[in-house]
From Swiss-Prot:
This is Orotidine 5'-phosphate decarboxylase. Keywords: Decarboxylase, Lyase, Pyrimidine biosynthesis. SUPFAM superfamilies: Ribulose-phoshate binding barrel. Catalyzes the decarboxylation of orotidine 5'-monophosphate (OMP) to uridine 5'-monophosphate (UMP). The gene is pyrF. It is an enzyme of class 4 (lyase). It comes from Pyrococcus abyssi (strain GE5 / Orsay). The active site is at K59.
Length: 208
């Protein structure tokens, strides 16, 4: 299942791409570029236009009170899930989880993640198994790590994998390794025909 990462600034462009691709997309992920460029209202507009759930990829990483202050406004704006960094500690994670559903970053897809994040993977998995978030982030660029995380993660916690497409990850490989969702951005929103690009990835996952 595909999560469309709309890492663009322009509201009109984001809404157009979302409408064009909604038949092949399970959820939409909004990150800082779109929120800064278009405001928090873009969350509700995307939901109203597509009927899809929205992930707010804020990667919250602050003290509990600040995390809670941010999260409250984002959930009120219509976000279904907020992505949170676990390295700031259980109390900061739980401050967000008390307000709504969260997704924890266990590993990231870029090379730099190997330096500081990956050494803490097992601790992040342990925290995820305790707080039972909706899901965790694992790297679609490294299917073997997706498999490692899946084998240790509590049943029912979803795995979402960024890094598909532009970063080199393959959608089908990530799903076969244990991912529930593949997060795809540039390969769809920068494509000449975003709908066709989304359909091709959808068909790849389905083996068609």
């Amino acid at each position: 299942m595909i999560v469309l990462a709309l890492d663009v600034y322009d509201e009109d462009r984001a809404l157009k791409i979302a409408e064009e691709t909604k038949d092949y997309v399970a959820m939409i992920k909004v990150n800082w570029p779109l929120i800064i460029g278009s405001g928090l209202d873009i969350i509700r507009k995307l939901k109203d236009r597509t009927g899809l759930k929205i992930i707010a990829d804020l990667k919250l990483a602050d003290i509990p009170n600040t995390n809670k202050l941010i999260a409250r406004k984002v959930y009120e704006a219509g976000a279904d899930y907020i992505i949170v960094h676990p390295f700031v500690g259980r109390d900061s994670v739980e401050a967000v989880n008390e307000l709504g559903e969260i997704i924890l970053v266990v590993e990231m897809s870029h090379p730099g993640a190997l330096e500081f994040i990956n050494p803490l993977t097992d601790k992040f998995i342990e925290l995820a198994n305790d707080v039972e978030p909706f899901g965790v982030i694992a790297p679609g660029t490294r299917p073997e790590r997706v498999k490692y995380i899946r084998e240790r993660l509590k049943e029912g916690v979803k795995i979402l994998t960024p890094g598909i497409g532009a970063q080199g990850g393959k959608a089908k490989e990530a799903i076969e390794a244990g991912a529930d969702y593949v997060i795809v951005g540039r390969s769809i929103y920068n494509a000449p025909n975003p709908r066709e690009a989304a359909r091709e990835i959808y068909d790849e996952i389905r083996g068609e």
